[in-house]
Amino acid sequence: MANDMAVIPEVWPVAADRVGIWLVSGDDAWRTMAVASDSEPHFEIELELMARGVRDRLAMMHSTSWRIDGPRLIVTYMAVLQAEDLVKGIWPGARPVTAKLLDAVGKPPVHAPDEAPAPRYIDVLAHGLRHLRFLMDTDPANAAAMGPLMRQHLEPLSPALAGLYAA
């Protein structure tokens, strides 16, 4: 008999400064343990942000996608963190996320219409950033919470859901 599929929340914490957008967590998202039946993913992400010492800098958080990863269901969140100064000065391990980077890695692998997508981690991050860009146009409260620098650096991105996996 098969076991139940674990639900694993992940958060991609990003911050913006005058230089650009940065992935505060470095090279990957932060993931929690499986969600207990008396909890839920959003709460687990808040606990993870507290454990990482960044909850007090949270400007906004939004669930952007989900995917299957082996025996797990990954629930993805983007967290926009506030930085009053240069991001690298606050989080030395932060990595820049630029439009050039997203262009350089190209589109996700193509799949047939009846197949599940198999996104790379960079595709998940790119989708999350484009989702934030979409919120700039559709959700005034979240757009305001992002702050002017994040909005400025997200502006060149276009929401690209339809056709993202097309050849």
Model-identified regions with their sequence ranges:
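The catalytic Nudix box helix
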Residues: 30-65
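Glutamate identity and glutamate-enriched acidic tracts
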Residues: 10, 40, 44-48, 84, ...
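N-terminal strand-loop-strand
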Residues: 1-31, 56-61, 78-85
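Polar low-complexity intrinsically disordered regions
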Residues: 1, 45-47, 122-128
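Nudix hydrolase/Nudix homology domain
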Residues: 24-36, 67-167
